[in-house]
């Protein structure tokens, strides 16, 4: 079962030096409209099965989308592919905008 991680927990852990992959599964236009101001691996949901080799299954992976729906599906897919440390970023970029950085547009 995949875990949930809040935007605040993710940012706190990242700032504490923990290595985690933040996987953004939104479309290109969404990333341009509302970018996450931290390093991300961007693989749109529709490309994940073809590009899964770009991810390290041993590394903790936190998946983000707009609101949490697509990221939950991708996190579940990754878990079925053998990834063991997979989390959904609760509330997606909308929650990030509300909790962390209100300059990020809501869309």
Regions found by a protein language model. Give the residues of each.
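Rhodanese-like catalytic fold shared by cysteine-dependent sulfurtransferases
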Residues: 1-21, 28-60, 69-107
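Short, surface-exposed ligand- or partner-binding patches at beta-edge/loop junctions that are enriched
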Residues: 64-65
């Amino acid at each position: 079962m995949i875990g949930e991680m809040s935007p605040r927990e993710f940012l706190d852990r990242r700032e504490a030096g923990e290595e985690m992959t933040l996987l953004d599964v939104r479309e290109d236009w969404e990333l341009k409209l509302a970018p996450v101001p931290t390093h991300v691996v961007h693989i749109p949901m529709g490309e994940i099965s073809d590009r899964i080799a770009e991810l390290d299954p041993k590394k903790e992976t936190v998946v983000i989308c707009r609101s949490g729906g697509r990221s939950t599906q991708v996190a579940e897919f990754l878990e079925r592919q053998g990834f063991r440390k997979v989390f959904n970023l609760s509330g997606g970029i909308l929650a990030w905008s509300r909790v962390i950085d209100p300059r990020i547009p809501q869309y």
